[in-house]
Amino acid sequence: MTKGILGRKIGMTQIFAENGDLIPVTVIHATPNVVLQKKTIENDGYEAIQLGFEDISEKRANKPQIGHAAKANTAPKRFIREIRGANIDEYEVGQEVKVDIFSEGEIVDVTGISKGKGFQGAIKRHGQSRGPMAHGSRYHRRPGSMGSIAPNRVFKTKNLPGRMGGERVTIQNLKIVKVDPERNLLLIKGNVPGPRKGLVIVKSAVKAAKKAK
């Protein structure tokens, strides 16, 4: 079954394995999440648990948010996300979910919002090849041809300049190197989406489970 927790990306560092290998890791700070609601097939059409992360003052919350959190005997939360595929029988409303639900060596998927890059050209945004840099070339970093004359329009799939980043991105099959329950930290091998202090969702890997079967 799927497990998950919400946290914030602290940054990257490196640690040494027992054999001396250098491992680049991303540190994620995941304070205890609270189960705010259990979604059931009878009432909602699907099964999921709703997790809340980071308290906010009641002054900054509206009445529905305060009432929803009160059902779980907790304060209103800044972030609320659902974890589908979880075994809802293992959870109760108001229960805390901590980093110790994961173990070292476990494979997870990490979801976050990618860094915003602003307005960028086709080369940086889509990885398109640039034009000749020779003196006689008439274009260097332009998108190039807009397509054939016959359609009398530009197709939607044409790679063009535009706003880059700020999108929901998931990196799959990352390995948990270390779990630190005392400091609520997860050390995950490699990089994860988003800037420092950005919200991330760590869930059990989908494809790794299929391979195991």
Curated annotation (Swiss-Prot):
It comes from the Bacteria. Residues 124-151 are annotated as: Disordered. InterPro entries: Ribosomal_uL3, Ribosomal_uL3_bac/org-type, Ribosomal_uL3_CS, Transl_B-barrel_sf. It holds the Pfam family Ribosomal_L3. GO terms for cellular component: cytosolic large ribosomal subunit. One of its GO terms (molecular function) is structural constituent of ribosome. Keywords: Ribonucleoprotein, Ribosomal protein, RNA-binding, rRNA-binding. One of its GO terms (biological process) is translation. One of the primary rRNA binding proteins, it binds directly near the 3'-end of the 23S rRNA, where it nucleates assembly of the 50S subunit. Part of the 50S ribosomal subunit. Forms a cluster with proteins L14 and L19. This is Large ribosomal subunit protein uL3. It comes from Geobacillus kaustophilus (strain HTA426).
